[in-house]
Structures are given as structure tokens and as C-alpha cells.
């Protein structure tokens, strides 16, 4: 069964820029998919459509069989957790309070506004922190953590939501290589253990090849590759990193180093 269905989707912004051009794809439940491509390829726009942060100009996006639109957006977003490049934590709050914000979609409007959580929520938050190895940091301020630790808090917040899908937008772009490896391994473990569908935007080819079940390569708003890591050849990478008929030499050289 498809966790995510994208049918004939285009996205055109008011300035006329067409970020996505006729995207058709299905992402299977419980799979780990990496969307790979250079900056400006449309990767982030695609993820934002999956969570209703953007709306398609044409076409439809469905999560768990439900169309992502304004009518049931809160309900759909409760199924879809986001992990962000810049962590999106409230730095002055404690780690556990940041994780608890993952429960807001399960609370009433009043509870969301006033950060009213139940004892059950606190238990879920503590369990999520244990999963990411940060139990001892629960009452520390978020801004006292390292970048890798802050991203672990972001993942714990996603887990606390009890989602069916986790969307991670360049989750390791600002991390060192060791932390990047640890974060990708953690997302992979969550996918395997919990059966949560994970979609990750990356530009690191080596990480994509090591952790993904499937790689979707994008260039200039189109899907130009769709296959397994073993099928990601040097020629496929050239197609992904070609820019308006000219190869993006810096990105391509880095990509080919891991082909």
C-alpha cells in the first residue's frame, strides 16, 4: 500500500517560477526513500507539499489515501512529522518541552495554545528521548546542546507525534560527518523498527546509497531518476546534477566520488 501518492503535481509560484513539473510517484508504506538532487531541484517544495505547507498548482497529494488539502489538514498533519535542517526548536525551553510539542496535534485548540499536556504525553516524550539517547538531557535548555543533539531532539519530537510518515528536509546539512552518520542511522532504525515511512531530502550521495531503500533523483523540478542505490550509476548522477545543459561541476565531482 502507498503511504504517499503524488499524482500529476506541478507547483508554480506567484512570480511564475515552476518548482515542480509533472511529478508522479508512489512511496510505499514502511519504506526509506531519499530524494537526491542539487539545490533548487525542487526537493524541499516536494516535501512541503506532502505536509500541506504548500499546495499544488495542479494535481493531488495523498497521505494514507487522504488528499492533502485545507478540509482535513490538521488531521493529515497529525500523521506526518517533520524533521528540519535547522532543528526548529524553542531554544529557551527544556528538551522535554520541545519534544512535548510533538503532541500538540493530539490536543484541543486550547491545549495547544497554552501548552497543556497530560501525564500520558510526558510518558510518550520520555520514551522518545530514550529512543534517541537523550534521557539525561530532558531538563536541559535546548540551546545548551550540540547540533547533533539538537537534531536528535527534533527526531524525538517527531516520534512523540506517533506519526505514520516522517519527512526530513536536509536533516544533516549543518552537521559534521560523524553526527550525520548517527542521525541517518537513527532515522533508518526508526523506519525498520516502527514501520514508519521515512522520506529524506539529501545532497550527500554516500549517505543516500548507504541508507535508502529507494532513491528519487530530481533536477529542475522533474524526477530524472527513480531506483535502488545499486542502480544509481555515474550516468544517473550526471543526469541529476546537470544544470540547463551544463554539468554543475562542483556538485557532480562530489557526487561521482561516491558513485
Curated annotation (Swiss-Prot):
Top-level enzyme category: translocase
Domain ABC transporter as annotated: residue spans: 4-245
Assembly description: The complex is composed of two ATP-binding proteins (PhnC), two transmembrane proteins (PhnE) and a solute-binding protein (PhnD).
Family as reported in the entry's similarity comment: Belongs to the ABC transporter superfamily. Phosphonates importer (TC 3.A.1.9.1) family.
Function: Part of the ABC transporter complex PhnCDE involved in phosphonates import. Responsible for energy coupling to the transport system.
InterPro entries (alphabetical): AAA+_ATPase (IPR003593), ABC_transporter-like_ATP-bd (IPR003439), ABC_transporter-like_CS (IPR017871), ABC_transpr_PhnC (IPR012693), MetN_ABC_transporter-like (IPR050086), P-loop_NTPase (IPR027417)
Sequence positions that bind ATP: 37-44
Cellular component, GO annotation: plasma membrane
Alphabetized NCBIfam families for the sequence: ABC_phnC (TIGR02315)
Membrane topology, from the record: Peripheral membrane protein
Main subcellular location of this protein, as a coarse class: membrane
GO molecular function: ABC-type phosphonate transporter activity; ATP binding; ATP hydrolysis activity
Keywords: ATP-binding, Cell inner membrane, Cell membrane, Membrane, Nucleotide-binding, Phosphonate transport, Translocase, Transport
Protein name from the UniProt record: Phosphonates import ATP-binding protein PhnC
Subcellular location: Cell inner membrane
Pfam families assigned: ABC_tran
Catalytic activity: phosphonate(out) + ATP + H2O = phosphonate(in) + ADP + phosphate + H(+)
E.C. no: 7.3.2.2
Amino acid at each position: 500500500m502507498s503511504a504517499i501518492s503524488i499524482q500529476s503535481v506541478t507547483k508554480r509560484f506567484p512570480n511564475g517560477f515552476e518548482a515542480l513539473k509533472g511529478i508522479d510517484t508512489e512511496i510505499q508504506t514502511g519504506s526509506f526513500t531519499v530524494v537526491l538532487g542539487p539545490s533548487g531541484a525542487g526537493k524541499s517544495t516536494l516535501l512541503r507539499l506532502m505536509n500541506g505547507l504548500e499546495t499544488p498548482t495542479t494535481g493531488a497529494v495523498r497521505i494514507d489515501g487522504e488528499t492533502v488539502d485545507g478540509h482535513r489538514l490538521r488531521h493529515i498533519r497529525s500523521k506526518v512529522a517533520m524533521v528540519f535542517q535547522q532543528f526548529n526548536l524553542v531554544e529557551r525551553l527544556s528538551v522535554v518541552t520541545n519534544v512535548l510539542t510533538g503532541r500538540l496535534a493530539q490536543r484541543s485548540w486550547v491545549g495547544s495554545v497554552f501548552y497543556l499536556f497530560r501525564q500520558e504525553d510526558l510518558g510518550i516524550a520520555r520514551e522518545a528521548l530514550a529512543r534517541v539517547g537523550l534521557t539525561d538531557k530532558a531538563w536541559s535548555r535546548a540551546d545548551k546542546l550540540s547540533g547533533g543533539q539538537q537534531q536528535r531532539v527534533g527526531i524525538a519530537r517527531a516520534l512523540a507525534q506517533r506519526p505514520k510518515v516522517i519527512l526530513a528536509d536536509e536533516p544533516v546539512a549543518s552537521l559534521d560527518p560523524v553526527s550525520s552518520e548517527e542521525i541517518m542511522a537513527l532515522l533508518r532504525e526508526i523506519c525498520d523498527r516502527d514501520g514508519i515511512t521515512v522520506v529524506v531530502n539529501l545532497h550527500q550521495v554516500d549517505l543516500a546509497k548507504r541508507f535508502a531503500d529507494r532513491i528519487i533523483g530530481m533536477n529542475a523540478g522533474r524526477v530524472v531518476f527513480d531506483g535502488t542505490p545499486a542502480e544509481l550509476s555515474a550516468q544517473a548522477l550526471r543526469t541529476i546534477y546537470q544544470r540547463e545543459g551544463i554539468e554543475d561541476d562542483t556538485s557532480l565531482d562530489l557526487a561521482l566520488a561516491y558513485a
